[in-house]
Every structure is written in structure tokens, then in C-alpha cells.
Amino acid sequence: MKKLTNNTMLGKLTLILNAVVLLLFIISMMMLLKFDKTNQVVISQRAGYEKAYEEYVMAQHPLKQDSAEVAYYQYKLDTLQQKTAASKDEKKTLSETIETTKQTLADKQKQQEQHLAQVAELEKEYGPAHENWEQLNSDNDAAKKKFWVIAWITIVAFLLKTFVFAHWGAKNNQNLQNIAPWMKDGMKPWMSYVAWFVPIYNLIKPLSFTKEVWNETDYSLEDAGIVTRDENSVDNSNLFMSIWWAFLLCSVWVMNFILFSTFFREGAFYVKTNHGSMVVIAIVIMVICMCLETVMILGYNKKNKQLLENESKF
């Protein structure tokens, strides 16, 4: 008699974690839409604010020159007024120069006052606009932070669920190692963890690992006379698992890329897609993926029970 383990509880734990991940994902999508609402306001008002800011800054540029010119002509006037003329002609020239300087100083002061008035007028418009802009950005940052908090919790929950699923697969593989001599040439239990967590490798290997466990279990049940080939063939397991894997890849990689491009970039996805529809599609794909995975786990748990109930035949 070979030693077999009951792994159905690990499968059920995976299902519970799936429900938690799905709930967190839906909440994160709602938070993403709230962020999108404030973010679209910020983006729509950015051009107007930047124009107002540029006008306000440009209006301030002449003030430094005005101050320098007023100071220069004031100093020149003070110097001329302290100067004494040695002759009548020099006195006349000095007097004319003083009058010219006074007039120039008055013109510069008037110009300075005009520029100050323009800045003051622009400040009346820019001040509230700046406060509104700061408030919009503050609200937007707060909404983004709330989303990322939920998003990271969802990611951690998904990684935990993935680990439990990988452990479930490893335990099922170990059962096969114990009852099927030919499995010594197949994948080892530890490869379940490698398949799920090694980048690039995890794009296809989890599917092939799961298929091998499922198919070899079917063969073991047939070989022991517990089920017939016809009974195993009706479930179309290979096609079913391929569809599950396609939805999983789409949910984890494709939709996350689309969501990131839609909500955190300002390119084609942001402009041309309906943001609410993208969220709905992401949720629907996730729900389908979870449903397929649920059916698959429950299906294999049934096979696990069949192995245990007929352990003496191996």
C-alpha cells in the first residue's frame, strides 16, 4: 500500500482565498474609478492652470527691471540735485538735466505702478485658481493612495492564494510519485513552486504542470480499474485547463497592463477607451477565471478522494 494524502482541504482553502482575492479586486476597481474621477478633473484643468501660472509669472518679470530703473533714476536725480554749477550755462544745463531725469523717473514710477497693478489683478484670478489646483491635486493624491493600499493588499492576497494553489499541486504530484512508478521521469513536486513563481517560466509552466498532474491521475485511476477511459474523456480536461489558463493570463497580465495604461497614463488607452467599461471587463474576466478555477479544483478534489478510497489498489 502506498501512502496517499488528502489534499482536498488545500483545494478548499484555495477557493476561499479566491473569493477573498475577487472581493478585494472588485473593491480596488471601485477605488480606481474614484481616483479616475478626480484624476480626469486634474487633467482637464491642467492646461488652464498652467496658462494662468505662466501669465502670472511672465507679468512679474518686468518688476525687477522696473525696480532697478526707478532706483537708478532716483539715485541719478539725488546726485544731480546735490551737484553745484560753476557757471550760468552749467546751471542751465544741470537744471534741464534734472528736469529730464525727474520726468524719466516719473515715467518709470508710473510704469512700475502699472505693472504692479497688472500683477495684482492677475493675482486676484491666479490666487483662487492656485488654491483650487492645490486642493484638486491633494484630493487626487489621496484617492490614488487609497487605491494603491487596496491594490497592494489584493496583490499580497493573490500571491498567498497562488502559493497555496502551488502547494496543493505539489501535494497532488507527490501522491502520484507514491503510486505511479513512471512519475519518476515526470515533474517533481517542487517544480510546482518554481512553475508559479519564476518569472517568464510562470507564463506557461503552471499549465503544463497542472495538466500533467490531472492527466497522470486520470491514467492512474484507469490503470487501477477505478474509472474507465470514457468516464475520463467526457470532461475535456485539457481544453478546459487551457481556457482557464488563457483567462488567468488575460486577467493577471493583459488586463493589468490595459488598466495601468488607461488610468495612469495619458496615451491612446486613456483617450480612446471608456474607463468604466475597462473596469467591468477586468472584473468579468476575473470572475470567469475564478469560476473556471473553482470547477477545476473541485474536479480534482473528487479525483483525490477516489485515490484515497481505493488506496489499496495501488
Regions found by a protein language model. Name each.
Residues K3-F25, D185-F197, N232-V252:
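Alpha-helical membrane-anchoring segments
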Residues V21-Q40, V254-N256:
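Alpha-helical transmembrane segments of multi-pass membrane proteins
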Residues L33-W148:
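Low-complexity, proline/glycine-enriched hydrophobic segments characteristic of transmembrane helices
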Residues K146-G169:
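Selective detector of the "anchor" transmembrane alpha-helix that sits immediately C-terminal
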Residues W168-Q177, L207-Y219, C291-F314:
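Cytosolic juxtamembrane helix at the C-terminal end of the final transmembrane segment
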Residues P189-K211:
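Hydrophobic, aromatic-rich membrane-embedded alpha-helical segments
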Residues P206-I243:
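Membrane-interface alpha-helices
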Residues N238, W244-F314:
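Juxtamembrane transition segments at transmembrane-helix termini in multipass membrane proteins
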